[in-house]
Amino acid sequence: MQPRDLSAHEPYVPGRGTKEVARELEVDPDSLIKLSSNENPHGPSPAAVDAIADTAETVNTYPKSSHTDLTARIADYWGLSPEQIWLSPGADGAIDYLSRAFLTPGDTMLISDPGFSYYPMSARYHHGSIRTYPVSKEQDFQQRASDILTQYDDERLLYVTTPHNPSGSELPIPEITALAEGVDDQTLIVIDEAYGEYSNNPSAIKLIQEYDNIAVLRTFSKAYGLAGLRIGYAAVPESWADAYARINTPFAANKTACQAALAAIEDQSHVEHSIETARWAREHYREELDARTWPSGGNFVLCEVGDGNAVAEAAKQEGVIIRDTTSFGLPECVRISCGTREQTKRAVDIISAVIEDVETATTTTESGVETEVGRP
């Protein structure tokens, strides 16, 4: 007995956790700064923590009312009807829901390269195929509707990540509008706004009242600090919102996650503090790191360092965990998440020193001189 052929499916590889790295280095986890997974360094709202505790004694019952209450609150926040909110276990779950609703065998999904690895995974799970459009370093990762439309070939689903991961670049509302008007009426444009709270641009959610070929993804994992609870949603046009009842997983958004998210929405001061910190940190990285960086609308910065793996490994040895972006096709770069002000300042000092050390070691090795880090 064997499953179907899964050879085309690449497994999702998450960033390593602090405890895992601490065991490897044989150090106290509290001595490490994790800046590799774009998490909220301030954690969840205290109100969300209280809601989690309050829910503990009732997890023996299904989350029907919690699900309904959160859906209604999100809808009210955006000025939509509750039917237009597809609650899901993280934004990943919403990606799968849209694949279930729109993909039939042989359909194609158009996604950015580089981009989030779960888009192609979801397409293949649902017997679809993938085509890509470039978001290239040579063009400073700029996203333009005209460039996307050049690669467009009547795909059923078209994903745009704004702010883009790992570059942080954005596609403004006028460009999204141009995209919506430039594709076939049977193509759904999915705007992934996982990092939308950190952006200075308005959300594309306002467009779904005008265009029935746009859906928008949002998550509570980032600015709301609830990554461990896996709660997100898609905002969809009213004309086909009723499809949710036919494709969603029953009670997929658990009660604890729903109650925590409901409390987190009400504590906007915590969200605003988290956003303010991230915006300060990303500018601090760009101003203080002695390496090329790009403007970012997210809670992270992409940094060109020459040898991303070597820099990430050396930074880890010094207690700062960052993301080597080789898996994104950018082996010369690292992605650095925004920490607290204290964490960010410490990270800048360590990463700057590490970049210099790696560059020196590489230059020395290439010149044929024996060093501690390598031989000719």
Swiss-Prot record:
Pfam families given in the database record: Aminotran_1_2
Residues bearing PTM N6-(pyridoxal phosphate)lysine: 222
Record GO biological process: L-histidine biosynthetic process
Region feature (Disordered): 1-21
Keyword check for Amino-acid biosynthesis: yes
Catalytic activity line of the entry: L-histidinol phosphate + 2-oxoglutarate = 3-(imidazol-4-yl)-2-oxopropyl phosphate + L-glutamate
InterPro entries: Aminotrans_II_pyridoxalP_BS, Aminotransferase_I/II_large, HisP_aminotrans, HistidinolP_aminotransfase, PyrdxlP-dep_Trfase, PyrdxlP-dep_Trfase_major, PyrdxlP-dep_Trfase_small
Highest taxon of the lineage: Archaea
Record family assignment: Belongs to the class-II pyridoxal-phosphate-dependent aminotransferase family. Histidinol-phosphate aminotransferase subfamily.
The protein's name: Histidinol-phosphate aminotransferase
Organism: Haloquadratum walsbyi (strain DSM 16790 / HBSQ001)
Lineage: Archaea, Methanobacteriati, Methanobacteriota, Stenosarchaea group, Halobacteria
